[in-house]
Amino acid sequence: MKGRIAILLLTAVVLTATSSIIPAPAEYTCAGDARYKTEALSRPRILQGSRAGKAFRTRVSGLPRFAQEEAYELTVGTCGATIRALTPEGVFRARQTLRKLELTDTSRLCCTIFDYPRYEHRGLMIDESRSFKGKEFIKKELDAMALLGLNSLHLHLTDAAGWRIEIKSHPELTERVAWRIGYTYTDWEAGGYKFASAGDPDAYGGYYSQEDLKEIVAYAAELYIQVIPEIEMPGHSMEVNRTYPELACIDASGRRRNSSWDLCPGNEGTFRLLEDVLSEVIAIFPCKYIHIGGDEAVMRDWPSCVNCRARMEAEGFTEVRQLQGYMVGRICRWLQEHGRTAVGWDEILETGLPRDAVVMSWRGSAGGEKAAAAGHKVIMSPNTHCYFDYYQDLIRKEPLAVGELTSLHWVYTYDPGDDPHVLGLQANLWCEKVPTVQHAEYMLYPRLFAIAEIGWSPKSRKKDPVEFRARAHSLLDALRKLGYNGFDMDTESDFAIAGLRRTQKGEIIYPSF
């Protein structure tokens, strides 16, 4: 095995101008050995729309609409830089490339770059329920996302561990379950899942006011990043049932049941609450997508619930799990009536789903492939490659995490495929084990660089993990100078550098492209 690792680790890397840019552009050419001065990057000439020229417009005309809008041509010469693009967004992407050249390009070779994204959706999810970090953290990560060409931030705002969004029609949600006893999720769990009020000296938590969220949305819009809010249902909803116990399932004896943290799909009050919440959510977030969760509903209380049984009888259902399909379908239709499109984790596909709903595949890629075959739009986010709460090096070297070894090399091997239903991909940072801003950035960088390159760079560009690692190291050094934390690539184990994994039986899994 040592010999195999040695081959995979073959280095002797020399950074060139191309290797300084992440994500790698579609086309890059150098103008001989002429070199530019840094000042040449500061005030580019902008040729936008019709001024971009017939040659550029013709060149991008065959691209998908989203790619045309983000496409640009950047020429950097001894006398300055010129940007050609159809839209302000294309100009913005070119400016971000100029910034990366300034941060990481040591060659200073004059060059021409023609560039556009491979996928429409290039995203990051941050779990704010389990560990609340606040708007300044979010804005800081938005800056990094923009530098990487990412264009979608998914905020996981509600879960059992805390409700993080102000709902003015239901202030109890933030008064009662935005604060808890336990700094980390593990502490809260060990202490018996206790909530607290904001004034409690032992309370940990917080929430976003609607003004906070509008500020985040506006900030993201300036960076051409959409913000997708997630309101979990029907599972992962203990905090809602704690706030409104009258909405929990009820058995034949009249006893309220909430053993599985699920909302009750038989209670009309559940839908009134969700519609109230979503009405305020869509007023805050202009994004066409609203994430409704849909994962890991346990359904333990539904079979004995008189309201759920009545719903099943009224709808002609023969299986309890059809109640999840009822709830998801009803909320999807409500969102559609209000001009929005529902997104949900891949479980929503299991019990029938309106055609316009988007499926986010997390349990590997199979759910996404099935959804695409059924005609649904898909965002690939498999836990095998895109879960950044997983270890990124050997367990003995790393802070407490979950899951399998998911190194930079391993993430870089992923490809979402070419099915036209696939909108793109997304990294997910769940925060049960990630309580601080510094820890979050440690888990994100440099692995998020790989997601950015997979989402942007053309498939025709052959992947070279050694060359990519060199570019990642350079960009990570630049981010550190800007005040970001990150994984220590200098101490990464040979096992992780080679992109290896070990099965539960101890067998070695080698990366493949």
Feature names for model-found ranges:
Residues 23-24, 67-289, 330, 334, ...:
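Feature activates predominantly on carbohydrate-active enzymes
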Residues 342-347, 352-357, 363-513:
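Flexible, acidic glycine-rich loops studded with aromatic residues
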Residues 2-12, 16-122, 341-349, 353, ...:
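Acidic, contiguous N-terminal accessory segments
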Residues 137-140, 208-215, 269-276, 322-330, ...:
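Generic recognition of stable, solvent-exposed alpha-helical segments in well-folded globular domains
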Residues 70, 230-232, 296, 347, ...:
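Acidic-residue sensor for enzyme active/binding pockets
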Residues 132-134, 160-166, 234-240, 291, ...:
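Flexible loop/turn segments at secondary-structure boundaries
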